[in-house]
């Protein structure tokens, strides 16, 4: 039959974001600002004006780059909130600037770059010292980055 549909390449259909009313957002929560997943560090609401809704002023820090983003939106409007997943993997080795990580199921991931800056130096230092460490990887909006390191249990 030529009409058969092949689903083998499809994903689970889970969205990388979900909508939430602006007035329901809270400090230390997450929101998408200027297309980037951010943690809300500052939030203020202006009073309802003569010509419209109360406005919410949001200030967020990109969870991956640390860059600051701001946005203002009416309190009744919906904003996108990123679905954030955090996983811990055991560090096996570092090769050509990439991390080799062991998953809970015993599979090896080699697609994650060694982070730049202090965290990258700390991971490399502990690896070179022969310490067993776990790397915390945060995933949001089809991006994954190593965000923390801790000793293995």
From Swiss-Prot:
Domain of life: Eukaryota
Modified residues (Hypusine): 50
Keyword set includes DNA-binding: no
PROSITE patterns linked: IF5A_HYPUSINE (PS00302)
InterPro entries attached to this UniProt entry: IF5A-like, IF5A-like_N, NA-bd_OB-fold, Rib_uL2_dom2, Trans_elong_IF5A_hypusine_site, Transl_elong_IF5A_C, Translation_prot_SH3-like_sf
Location(s), subcellular: Cytoplasm; Nucleus; Endoplasmic reticulum membrane
Cellular component terms (Gene Ontology): cytosol; endoplasmic reticulum membrane; intracellular membrane-bounded organelle; nucleus
SUPFAM superfamilies: Nucleic acid-binding proteins, Translation proteins SH3-like domain
Residues with the N-acetylalanine modification: 2
GO biological process: positive regulation of translational elongation; positive regulation of translational termination; spermatogenesis; translational elongation
Family label: Belongs to the eIF-5A family.
Main function: Translation factor that promotes translation elongation and termination, particularly upon ribosome stalling at specific amino acid sequence contexts. Binds between the exit (E) and peptidyl (P) site of the ribosome and promotes rescue of stalled ribosome: specifically required for efficient translation of polyproline-containing peptides as well as other motifs that stall the ribosome. Acts as a ribosome quality control (RQC) cofactor by joining the RQC complex to facilitate peptidyl transfer during CAT tailing step.
Protein name: Eukaryotic translation initiation factor 5A-2
Organism: Homo sapiens (Human)
Classification of source organism: Eukaryota, Metazoa, Chordata, Craniata, Vertebrata
Encoding gene, per UniProt annotation: EIF5A2
């Amino acid at each position: 039959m030529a009409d058969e549909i092949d689903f083998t390449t499809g994903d689970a259909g889970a969205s990388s974001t979900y909508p939430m009313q602006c007035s329901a957002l809270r400090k230390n929560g997450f929101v998408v600002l200027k297309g980037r997943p951010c943690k809300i560090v500052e939030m203020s609401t202006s009073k309802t004006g003569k010509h419209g809704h109360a406005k919410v002023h949001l200030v967020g820090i990109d969870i991956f780059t640390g860059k600051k983003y701001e946005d203002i939106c009416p309190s009744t409007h919906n904003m996108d909130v990123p679905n954030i997943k955090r996983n811990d993997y055991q560090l096996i080795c570092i090769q050509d600037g990439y991390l080799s990580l062991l998953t809970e199921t015993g599979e090896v991931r080699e697609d994650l770059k060694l982070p730049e800056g202090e965290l990258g130096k700390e991971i490399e230092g502990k690896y070179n010292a022969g310490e067993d460490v776990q790397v915390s990887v945060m995933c949001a909006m089809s991006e994954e980055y190593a965000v923390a390191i801790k000793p293995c249990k």
